[in-house]
Swiss-Prot record:
PANTHER family: IMMUNOGLOBULIN HEAVY CHAIN (PTHR23266). The keyword Lyase does not apply. GO terms for molecular function: antigen binding. InterPro entries: Ig-like_dom (IPR007110), Ig-like_dom_sf (IPR036179), Ig-like_fold (IPR013783), Ig_sub (IPR003599), Ig_V-set (IPR013106), IgHV (IPR050199). This is Ig heavy chain V region J539. The keyword Nucleus does not apply. It holds the Pfam family V-set. This chain was isolated from a myeloma protein that binds galactan. GO terms for cellular component: extracellular region; immunoglobulin complex. One of its GO terms (biological process) is immunoglobulin mediated immune response. SUPFAM superfamilies: Immunoglobulin. It comes from the Eukaryota.
Length: 119
């Protein structure tokens, strides 16, 4: 059974940093592209980016590539999202996903909530 479990979310101040993690199990993690997707309150899904199985290629949504860094550790079956210079509009539920590729099914985690607030 494919499982994706995100962690690391929480409250962060504007301008701050946060690193999200995703633990994968139930499939050969090292063979798949992996993605991060987010959903802000009351808005649709927004694709953040994706990383090649060997980390050789990382693609980002252009507006986010200067503040988010996607990485992975195949030995630990883990995917990461380093967030920096966060703003209120980065408040969202962040999902780790193995999206559709070459006929394979898509799988999503439950998400981890990031709230950007000075309070």
């Amino acid at each position: 059974e494919v499982k994706l479990l995100e962690s690391g979310g929480g409250l962060v101040q504007p301008g701050g940093s946060l690193k999200l993690s995703c633990a994968a199990s139930g499939f050969d993690f090292s063979k798949y592209w992996m993605s991060w997707v987010r959903q802000a309150p009351g808005k649709g899904l927004e694709w953040i980016g994706e990383i090649h199985p060997d980390s050789g290629t990382i693609n980002y949504t252009p507006s986010l590539k200067d503040k988010f860094i996607i990485s992975r550790d195949n030995a630990k079956n883990s995917l990461y999202l380093q967030m920096s210079k966060v703003r209120s509009e980065d408040t969202a539920l962040y999902y780790c996903a193995r999206l559709h590729y070459y006929g394979y099914n898509a799988y999503w985690g439950q998400g981890t909530l990031v709230t950007v607030s000075a309070e």
